[in-house]
Amino acid sequence: LLEIEKGKRFLVEALFFVLLFAFIYWTMHYVFFMDGSDLHSGFTTFGDFSPHTAMIRSFSFHNNFPTQYPHYGGVDVKYHFMFQFYAGILEYLGMRIDIAFNLISAASLWAFLVMLYFFAKQLTGYISVGVISVIMFFCRSSFAGLDKLVQAVISGDWESFWSNVEFIGYTAH
């Protein structure tokens, strides 16, 4: 009987992790995606994607060795080298740049959240604490997202909840 309970718990955790990865990838794709030949990025992130996509393309289309920033000639690469190199290699091998970028980003965030889940679960002994820890990670140090969700449930106004394009809450952005 104990083995059956462990098997059920494993399936629930596995389903949680699969859904978590799907959610993370969906959020990544929502911010950075291709539509035909146009590359789209989120309103608050487009400035950050410019040097990253240039660096990725310097590996996928060119021979950027010794490695330098395309935007800042002569400057040694200080950070994100392996991420950009790996995304460049994936694009070189045929994967679209948005999928390569989002897949690595989603896998990295997912791996961190899996570790957070197991740390919280191991620390307290409760699966629910692990799940709550993962959910709270997305709350930006406030309950504004949960507050917005509760308001949508109470008012029944799901249209404004799903179509919201402005920052919510009381934290700085």
Residue ranges and their predicted role:
Residues 11-18:
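Membrane-proximal intrinsically disordered regions of secretory-pathway and membrane-system proteins
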